[in-house]
Design a protein with these regions (language model features):
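Bacterial Sec-dependent N-terminal signal peptides
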Residues: 1-23
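Short, thiol/selenol-centered motifs that function as redox-active sites or metal-ligating centers
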Residues: 61-70, 139, 195-198, 202
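Structural microenvironment flanking redox-active thiols in thiol-disulfide oxidoreductases
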Residues: 68-112, 123-129
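Short, internal strand/loop/helix patches
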Residues: 107-151
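Thiol-/selenol-based redox modules, centered on thioredoxin-like
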Residues: 141-202
Length: 202
């Protein structure tokens, strides 16, 4: 009985999280830039990366078990694609609703896990809402054209959220590799598996 209630609670949480984000990007949409505070105290925007051909934007956090399970894979993605598709992590969790996700906690977490990429705080949650992010982690791969940034992939990192050794489909890597090669992305959208973003008005 307790297991059934727990599963029902998780389902309700996901439903509520999704209902709080009524808009958001779809594949093919134009993504707008943002300027958010990084863990080093500086403001970061996509425009800062003049040589980037695109971006791997990941809405993430410190506390979700799925985010923790993906941590090593996220660091690896950054190392693999930093030259032309830099990774940008964004924490949109309300620190009032999610203990352990304050800005100070982010600084400590990034240092502990040797982050070599920006880890930005979306204090107003406006960027998460604009993108339509619902879970952590939730990935948006952006492709830079001559005039703007196009959303090329939305979803999960791979097909094994809890166990890196069981991965058979690497959706983000496949998407970026396709963009690099000028080829269509085979799977441009998947379901983001993770914890619901903790909204201020939840």
């Amino acid at each position: 009985m307790k297991i059934v209630n727990f599963v029902s609670l998780i389902g309700l949480t996901i439903l509520i999280a999704g209902s709080l984000v009524k808009n958001g990007y779809e594949v093919g949409d134009t993504a707008t830039d943002f300027k958010l505070k990084n863990i080093d105290g500086k403001l970061v925007s996509l425009a800062d990366f003049k040589e980037a051909k695109g971006f791997i934007v990941i809405f993430d956090c410190n506390t979700c078990p799925y985010s923790k399970a993906y941590n090593g894979r996220i660091v690896a993605l950054s190392k693999k694609y930093s030259k032309d598709f830099p990774l940008i992590a964004i924490n949109a969790n309300s620190n009032e609703e999610s203990q352990g996700d304050s800005y100070e906690d982010m600084v400590k977490y990034a240092k502990k896990h040797n982050y070599d990429f920006p880890y930005l705080v979306d204090a107003t949650q406006e960027i998460a809402r604009a993108y339509g992010a619902t879970n952590t982690p939730h990935v948006f791969v952006l492709n830079r054209t001559h005039t703007d940034l196009k959303v090329a992939y939305i979803g999960t990192i791979d097909d094994s959220p809890r166990n890196a050794s069981s991965v058979t489909k690497r959706y983000v890597e496949d998407a970026v590799d396709a963009l690099r090669a000028g080829k269509p992305i085979t799977t441009p959208k998947t379901k983001a598996i993770g914890c619901g973003i903790r909204w201020k008005d939840a």
